[in-house]
């Protein structure tokens, strides 16, 4: 009898102890997780955006807000707030410059996020040093540049004020390439001459003697260039405030069609299986087994459906992402605004401004598919014919901010 009592007593105390242990463990985990989430919310750098105004004028042109945006009345430059801090992985691992969480990084990089500092947004635009530009050769280019800088500055002053959403500094600068010798920051905009700009940066860095001898794979997969998010916070802050910051843009419709032609009309081991298969599966009724299997043959109309779909089967890509989301012009306040439409003149003028070697000129060759006709307004019209007027309007609305801030003419839809 005593043995039974002892056995039941031990069993009872053991059960009670186990329950107590489980309760304490759950309480500790919940308490600890709460602290972590609270700390996470405190990390990062705060930036700010502003309210929609009704219109903005340049010296010779007026930019009108789309009617639907006037009705919405929200923040024009709504940056959003990512749930995790993102960092770029190797371009050789994924052609579109995918992202991963910085939580996978070790050491000093994590320390950066534990000690946030306040950035003064927007950054102050630096006056261009024109002491190295001689004669009247660049007079027209200089006048054009001043108009663009002034227009973007006025646009951001009216539309780009902020109300304090949190956004991480390292995400904002993740597409900016650094050339320390000539103190240049170049924000990469795919399909706006970025491959040749990377060639120029490699020459300026002393990594190559000529921009004409660097292959496409070396440019994009060689990992020769540093992006601004690879530096610590002090290094990022110093470069943003002292280096010459440049961005080169392109008419949004031309850039979109150029990206489609490059990625979907030619063999591609990444875009066809990753994007093509998902697009065909969702937007092509009765798709063939072959198309579903290899993702080749995406039509522009199907691509447009994907672009405009709030529930895309696969995420956005830098080749057709908006410049406002790639380079954050109203936060970075770029010192030089070049355009693809005047790329040669703009780029060579910029090289003069930064004191590049006299023999270095911007390459004018087509990086890939050289036999294809360049994407221009005529080519764009051929692709837009496949879309209804409403669909064309929706694409314009998608890129409306890029049209507005860089003073591009509204297309005839």
Swiss-Prot record:
Side Lumenal, residues = 27-413
- Membrane spanning stretches: 6-26
The EC code for this enzyme is 2.8.2.-
Q: Which residues are glycosylated?
A: 129, 213, 286, 294, 407
- Keyword line: Carbohydrate metabolism, Glycoprotein, Golgi apparatus, Membrane, Signal-anchor, Transferase, Transmembrane, Transmembrane helix
Q: Looking at the keywords, is Glycoprotein present? A: yes
Where does it reside? Golgi apparatus membrane
Question: Pfam families this protein is in?
Answer: Sulfotransfer_2
> Which InterPro entries is this protein grouped with?
Carb_sulfotrans_8-10, Sulfotransferase
Membrane topology per the entry is: Single-pass type II membrane protein
User: What tissues has this protein been observed in?
Assistant: Highly expressed in kidney and pituitary gland.
Q: Which residues lie on this side of the membrane: Cytoplasmic?
A: 1-5
Question: Which major enzyme category is it?
Answer: transferase
Molecular function (GO) terms listed?
dermatan 4-sulfotransferase activity
What is the protein name for this chain?
Carbohydrate sulfotransferase 9
Please give the family membership noted in the entry.
Answer: Belongs to the sulfotransferase 2 family.
Provide GO CC annotations from the record.
Answer: Golgi membrane
Stated role: Catalyzes the transfer of sulfate to position 4 of non-reducing N-acetylgalactosamine (GalNAc) residues in both N-glycans and O-glycans. Participates in biosynthesis of glycoprotein hormones lutropin and thyrotropin, by mediating sulfation of their carbohydrate structures. Has a higher activity toward carbonic anhydrase VI than toward lutropin. Only active against terminal GalNAcbeta1,GalNAcbeta.
Q: Which gene encodes it?
A: Chst9
Organism encoding this protein:
Mus musculus
Task: Please tell me where 3'-phosphoadenylyl sulfate binds in this chain.
Answer: 190-196, 250-258
Q: Name one GO biological process term.
A: carbohydrate biosynthetic process
